[in-house]
UniProtKB/Swiss-Prot annotation:
Protein encoded by which gene: Hfm1
A Gene Ontology biological process term: spermatogenesis
Any matching Pfam family: SNRNP200_wHTH
Upper taxonomic lineage: Eukaryota, Metazoa, Chordata, Craniata, Vertebrata
Name of the protein in question: Probable ATP-dependent DNA helicase HFM1
Needed cofactors: Zn(2+)
Length: 1434
């Protein structure tokens, strides 16, 4: 008698019944080949309702209602059978002499349930009853004939039934297992053929044929269905040794009765979702009724690889059946713990549910928040807990969240994970809260949210079911143990000795030499997958294995591996691949990874080493999985794998699509062996980790107004898994084990109150005396941007003067980057990026070498912003991850600083840094073209090398030249120019309103969009592009901040705002900045000086610098913001007494110039003797020189042809009367141009001579006779006159308007105009109506060494020269006189001509001497000639 536990069948197997031992098999046998037809299409399978109606017509149902479900031992859903190729045959020894016909009408009524189309596994007793129906009397029963006639009349009604009735004529390839089968059909009289299978021919495909086992031509389960003997013949087969029985274990229950649901129970329009199989497997069939015919919450715990995904698809089908078309107000959320699973599910469901009419959208960390607009129209949202947490923190603003009807949770056992678990727990609790609040707010009862959760095998699944209750009753919980696993998995834990002195690194290296013995013992010459903890460990282990072992591979397989190795970029991988060993990790090139995955899937690669990337969702055909070392490097330290990681890795073994049996081996230390034995036995209870991360989630709920006081906070805690587990296991959460329910609730409430006080300490929430909570703006920003509490705490301590470098350093140390690891192999590249004299390095190098995670993050951020290429692929991946989180932190920081009313410098730098993260460029980068479409880093570098460093230059360039530069065909250049032309072009105007006060002023700021008419038709910038206006004063206080949308400017072309300004203590200067949100190169930075009544600390001047493309470094901006002023300005020349200024303002009462309103005040007189100034100048020039005096004298004497110095002595001549200078000492001081705070540019300007101004006048008489000039070589003064020609060239080359001044407004004693007429003409030129105000340029002093340049009209020059010659005819020698007149004739008649005062050369440095202050016009030239004698001497 066969036993019930012998009934193990392959899912592709024909349904054989065990032979009757009383039967005699004749010796004469004939070999017969049996072929199976291809599987019928799903559309050909009739509905169960149709079959039931047909059975009713036979009147065979009797009293009992026929069950709706079909039972079969066919292959489970979504998993292909493990079988041989379709070309292989199974040979049966067929006895032609023994044929018996069985009429269904003669069967026992107690065993007639099979007639309803139900395929049943029967117990031994039922087997006997059924076999006993084959008596002759039963065959000759009158009922048989009647049933036969009826069946013949209906034979042509169904193509499907005709197909089932045909003799099998196709090849069938499958494995047979032990057991007996009873198969009956109601369609027609079925011939029962007793067949004996010879032992030598029974099996043509053994398990040794592994290549076929992993063939890509996988046999479908519906092929077995059509070939199962329903058509005509039923075979009786003897028992076989169980070779492949584990994958048929489903369908067997302890009672001997199991049933499988048919796909035909699904409505016809949804059957294509399950088109891969005709029947659901045992686990899915057990959950079928609860999922498809009820709306209750559902939790299922089943082994990995048991087809749990179909559980979700059944729940979706139920919702589609209930909700009418067009499904607009219905959303389904699928949540998985990792992005790899989300991506896999998205690709799968997009194909399955797309034809049905559902729109799928993936929402993970790789997607930006802009995708929220797209998920508004998505029906199925596939996301991670972290991403859905950030979305639902604004659920009151996002109405689509209230449209969620079905919430699917994959891998719900992740709730016990320290990092991911709290987020998963809070998200599910929040979705329950959304449902309850919606029920309270709406009068009509809203449609509830259904929760369906899937978990690996865990001991306390009832706790999860209780947590997912609908408020009235817990969720339905279905627990399936390992006995129902489709593929039997053998789990082995191997412990290896590890001494206390041995590091984890050395232990991991030692395991590399033990991997081969594990593979040889457990792989059974089938594909093996080895998980390693690090990327470097993967390469090392593969290299060791290649040296130790040679895997037997066929010649064809070796040729395929060698051919694939040619395409591999990784040289080490190329060496190991030809020996049948490969490796795979996230740091490899994508092409290499795909190629290795393909080789392993096809079976050509026997061994694959990998990191955790393949453990999460990748379905690889591994018979053996080896976890080499249970320690991995995370967060800077070695720690044990979590249970979730272990289960995911061993879940890669024995996938039903590829294998029948599988083995998982864990290699660990002896000390931890027992821990993993218990873990694999699924004895670890799922506990909550929410109590360790409660503070961020409490803040989020307060922002959502879910929690308003302590009592409601406790109510919210009751909706979490933490509360359920704390009641059952209080000691795990730090509570006393003897506490009752009230005591535990009090402890939880105390825990909440502690975290709430921490939030209140940082002003994230407001608490009153009644312990009521209200969120603050800072708390809202923390919740909305998903920022950790520690990060907020770090930035709350900012001083307000932080530079860009400071902010980047603070961001790099945030907890959001804890998952970034610093690998030893990366340090060389990072140090090269940081400091390298031969390469382009980062903008703000770090003093030390790269040693920490924070330094790595800092370096990669700066490298990306500086457009420095990073060659290492792993570092490139890390950079993408860093910028994803860093951009979010920077956006939060700019909003946080603005909300906290922090200082101006840190606000401006945070806004600029936000834009830098978005554009991935520095704010002063020359690679502005990289922001345009079709321009990458390579083309951008080409444009920078060609000098196209701004949008203005690109727009002015010729389109054909652009194409030549970029090596592109037309119309590429035209497209680039059009893109630039349609960028917004801002213009900023500031003026002061004529209402003055000593502490307050009013300014009018106007922002003009110059090309707003052009932007009406086309825009390059996105629709939501805006510019931020930030105004700050010299005290580092924010005066004004506002975001101006482009859409506002497009309406009228401008935006005007009146702003009240309070007087600053340090200076009246304002810094006005317009920062684009999306583009580098559009910013405007401008200075404006406000006028106030009352005493002033600084020289009153208006300084305005306008730049459409910023070129200033904001890293030291806070220093400039608080300085006395850093702008370039120009003060007009002044006459004695009050007078009107010469600004050409249209409305002098409304402009920002204070001199336009009150006039120009008279400068104080400076009484200083000529000799004192002269000696001061000599001292200054002598101090500047870098050469010793003796050496300089020697050089100059050689140049002067050894002139005797005695000839230059000062000889008093009584014949020349002394000229009194006292009458000239009261000459009013002439105002000059001032340049302030430019030490870094004008570092060589000397301030020493100014100390002589107030000294007593020296009564020294210094005169020279005419014979001094007669003896002096006139050629020594040629250099002086050539300098005047240089000034003329300077004016013609575009520097004619350049005016310079001394440092900090201090006036050197000789920095005056050369004559009185020059002074008068200088004033007249400044007041010319045709000349606008000029701005200082940096190049004047650095290029020419000038400190004062006065413009002289030609007519004044001619008159002055004639006057000078008439008054002092004997002052100059004839040579000098001819030179002066020749120079005056060559001067062009241009108002831009500059006449430069005479200079005295001194070892490369020239010093200007202006004597017009101390002498009358006729005596000034005499003194200049005197000083020219000493050219080069001092």
């Amino acid at each position: 008698m066969p036993k019930s536990d012998d009934c193990f069948f392959s899912m592709d197997n024909l349904f054989f019944s065990s032979p009757d031992e009383t039967e005699n098999f004749p010796v004469k046998e004939k070999s017969l080949d049996w072929f199976l037809p291809p599987a019928p299409l799903i559309s050909e399978i009739p509905d169960i309702q149709e079959l039931e109606e047909e059975i009713e017509s036979y009147k065979l149902l009797g009293k009992g209602k026929m069950p709706r479900m079909l039972t079969s031992n066919l292959k489970i859903i979504n998993e292909d059978t493990n079988c041989i190729s379709p070309t292989q045959k199974i040979h049966f020894s067929y006895n032609v002499h023994e044929q018996d016909y069985l009429n269904l009408g003669g069967s026992n009524n107690n065993d007639m349930s099979h007639v309803a189309g139900k395929l049943m596994y029967g117990s031994s007793q039922k087997y006997k009853n059924h076999m006993g129906a084959k008596s002759p009397s039963a065959r000759s029963s009158p009922g048989d004939t009647k049933l036969h006639d009826v069946a013949e009349d209906r034979q042509g009604t169904s193509a499907f039934k005709k197909r089932l009735s045909r003799t099998c004529d196709s090849e069938h390839d499958c494995d047979y297992a032990d057991g007996s089968l009873n198969l009956s059909s109601h369609i027609s009289p079925v011939k029962l053929t007793q067949t004996k299978i010879s032992k030598e021919n029974a099996w043509t495909c053994s398990n040794s044929k592994q290549k076929r086992q992993y063939s890509t031509n996988k046999f479908k389960a519906n092929d077995a269905f059509s070939a199962s003997g329903i058509g005509k013949d039923i075979f009786k087969a003897p028992s076989f040794p169980a070779a492949s029985q584990p994958h048929d274990i489903q369908g067997i229950t302890p009672n001997g009765l199991g049933s499988l649901k048919a796909v035909t129970e699904i409505p016809a329009k949804f059957r294509n979702i399950f088109k891969e199989f005709p029947y659901f497997n045992y686990i899915q069939s057990k959950a079928f009724d609860d999922l498809l015919y009820t709306d209750r919450n559902f939790v299922i715990c089943a082994p990995t690889g048991s087809g749990k995904t179909v559980v979700f698809e059944l729940a979706i089908t139920r919702l589609l059946m209930e909700v009418p078309l067009p499904w607009l107000n219905m959303k389904i959320v699928y949540m998985a713990p990792i992005k790899a699973l989300c991506s896999q599910r998205f690709d799968d469901w997009k194909e399955k549910f797309g034809p049905v009419g559902l729109n799928c959208k993936e929402l993970t960390g790789d997607t930006v928040m802009d995708d929220l607009f797209e998920i508004q129209h998505a029906n199925i949202i596939i996301t991670t807990p972290e991403k859905w947490d950030s979305v639902t923190r604004k659920w009151r603003d996002n109405s689509f969240i209230q449209l969620v009807r079905l919430f699917l949770i994959d891998e719900v056992h992740v709730i016990k994970d320290e990092n991911r678990g709290p987020t998963l727990e809070v998200v599910v609790s929040r979705m329950k809260t959304v449902q309850s609040l919606s029920r309270d707010l709406e009068s009509a009862s809203p449609v509830p949210v259904r929760f369906v959760a899937v978990s690996a095998t865990i001991p306390n699944a009832e706790d999860i079911a209780e947590w997912l209750s609908d408020g009235e009753r817990p969720a339905v919980c279905l627990k399936m143990d390992e006995s129902h696993r489709p593929v039997k998995l053998q789990k082995v834990v191997l412990g290896f000795p590890c001494s206390s002195s041995q590091t984890e690194f050395k232990f991991d290296l030692a395991l590399n030499y033990k991997v081969y013995s594990v593979i040889r013992t457990y792989s059974d010459q089938k594909p093996t997958l080895v998980f390693c903890s690090t990327r470097k460990g993967v390469q090392q282990a593969a290299s060791v294995l290649v040296k130790d072992a040679k895997f037997i591979i066929s010649v064809e397989q070796k040729l395929r591996l060698q051919k694939s190795a040619y395409s591999i970029r990784d040289s080490k991988l190329k060496d190991t691949l030809v020996y049948g060993v490969g490796y795979h990790h996230a740091g490899m090139e994508l092409s290499d990874r795909k190629l290795v995955e393909g080789l392993f899937t096809s079976g050509d690669l026997p061994v694959l080493f990998t990191t955790s990337t393949l453990a999460m969702g990748m379905n690889m055909p591994a018979h053996l999985v080896v976890i080499k070392s249970t320690m991995h490097y995370s967060g800077g330290v070695f720690e044990e794998y979590s249970e979730t990681d272990i289960l995911q890795m061993i879940g890669r073994a024995g996938r039903p699509q590829f294998d029948t049996t599988a083995t998982a081996v864990i290699m660990t230390r002896l000390s931890t062996r027992e821990k993993y034995v218990q873990m694999l036995a699924c004895n670890d209870t799922v506990e909550s980790s929410l109590h360790r991360h409660l503070i961020e989630h409490l803040n989020a709920e307060i922002v959502l107004h879910t929690i308003t006081d302590v009592n409601i906070a406790l109510d919210w805690i009751r909706s979490t898994m933490l509360y359920i587990r704390a009641l059952k296991n209080p000691s795990h959460y730090g509570f006393s084990s003897g506490l009752n329910k009230d005591g535990i609730e009090a402890k939880l409430q105390e825990l909440c109150l502690k975290n709430l006080k921490d939030l209140s300490s940082l002003d994230l929430i407001k608490m009153d005396e009644d312990v009521n909570f209200k969120p603050t703006e800072a708390g809202r920003l923390m919740a909305w941007y998903y920022i950790t509490f520690e990060t907020v705490k770090k930035f709350c301590a900012i001083s307000g003067k932080e530079t860009l470098l400071d902010l980047i350093s603070m961001i790099s140390s945030c907890n959001e980057f804890l998952d970034v690891q610093l690998r030893i192999s990366e340090k060389r590249i990072l140090n090269t990026l940081n400091k390298d004299p031969n390469r382009i390095t980062i903008r703000f190098p770090m003093a030390e070498r790269i040693k920490t995670r924070e330094m790595k993050v800092n370096c990669l951020i700066q490298a990306q912003l500086g457009c420095i290429p990073i060659q290492d692929f792993a570092l490139t991946q890390d950079t993408v991850k860093i910028f994803r989180n860093g951009s979010r932190i920077a956006r939060w920081l700019s909003d946080f600083v603005a909300a906290q009313e922090k200082k101006f410098a840190v606000l401006l730098n945070s806004v600029i840094l936000t834009k830098c993260f978005k554009c991935k460029l520095w704010e002063n980068s020359k690679h502005v073209s990289k922001q345009l479409d079709k321009i990458g880093i390579s083309l951008s570098n080409t444009m920078v090398n060609a000098g196209l460093t701004s949008f203005k230059k690109i727009e002015e360039a010729n389109a054909r030249e652009l194409e030549l530069i970029l090596n592109r065909h037309p119309p590429f250049g035209t497209q680039i120019k059009e893109a630039v032309a349609h960028l917004p072009k801002y213009e900023l105007e500031v003026e002061q309103i004529a209402r003055y006060s000593d502490i307050k002023a009013e300014i009018l700021v106007t922002i003009i969009l110059r090309n707003f008419e052009q932007l009406q038709t086309k825009r390059t910038a996105p629709d939501f592009h805006y510019a931020t206006l930030i105004i700050g004063d010299a005290d580092n206080q924010v005066v004004f901040k506002h975001k101006i949308m482009d859409s506002v400017l497009l309406k009228s072309g401008n935006w005007v705002k009146k702003i009240d300004v309070k007087r600053a203590l340090i200076s009246e200067d304002l810094s006005i900045n317009l920062i684009s949100s999306d583009y580098v190169g559009l910013d405007i930075h401008q200075k404006f000086t406000v006028f106030y009544f009352g005493p002033r600390k600084f020289v009153n001047e208006t300084a305005m610098e306008r730049s459409s493309e910023t070129d200033i470094s904001h890293s030291d901006y806070s220093g400039r913001a608080t300085a006395t002023g850093s702008s370039k300005g120009m003060a007009t020349c002044k006459k004695p007494g009050n007078r009107e200024c010469h600004h050409h303002c249209k409305n002098k009462h409304a402009c920002g110039h204070d001199c336009c309103k009150i006039g120009v005040a008279q400068k104080p007189e400076v009484k200083e003797s000529a000799m004192s100034s002269y000696l001061s100048d000599l001292k200054s020039r002598d101090a500047v020189s870098s050469l010793p005096l003796a050496k300089r004298l020697k050089i100059q004497m050689n140049k002067s042809q050894n002139v005797d110095l005695k000839e230059f002595g000062f000889t008093p001549r009584p014949s020349l009367s002394s000229i009194s200078r006292s009458e000239y000492l009261n000459t009013p001081e002439l105002s000059i141009l001032e340049q302030r705070n430019q030490h870094e540019i004008y570092g060589k300007v000397q301030q020493g001579p100014s100390e002589y101004r107030d000294k007593e006048v020296l009564g020294v008489n210094l005169e020279l006779g005419n014979e001094v000039w007669d003896d002096f070589d006139d050629e020594s003064l040629i250099e002086v006159m050539s300098l005047s020609a240089d000034a003329e060239k300077m004016a013609a080359s575009g520097f004619g308007d350049t005016r310079d001044s001394s440092l900090g407004g201090s006036k050197l004693p000789f920095q005056k105009s050369s004559s009185r007429f020059q002074r008068d003409n200088s004033n007249s030129f400044a007041s010319s109506p045709g000349k606008p105000d000029a701005y200082l340029r940096d190049c004047s002093r650095s290029s020419f060494g000038l400190s004062s340049v006065a413009e002289i009209p030609q007519r004044a020059e001619n008159a002055s020269l004639a006057n000078l010659q008439e008054r002092r005819p004997l002052t100059l020698s004839p040579v000098i006189e001819r030179m002066c007149f020749a120079h005056s004739k060559k001067t062009p008649q241009s108002p831009k001509f500059k006449e430069v005062d005479i200079f005295i050369g001194n070892s490369g440095s020239k010093k200007e001497i202006d004597l017009s202050k101390y002498y009358p016009d006729d005596a000034a030239e005499e003194m200049k000639a005197l000083l020219g004698i000493f050219n080069g001497i001092f």
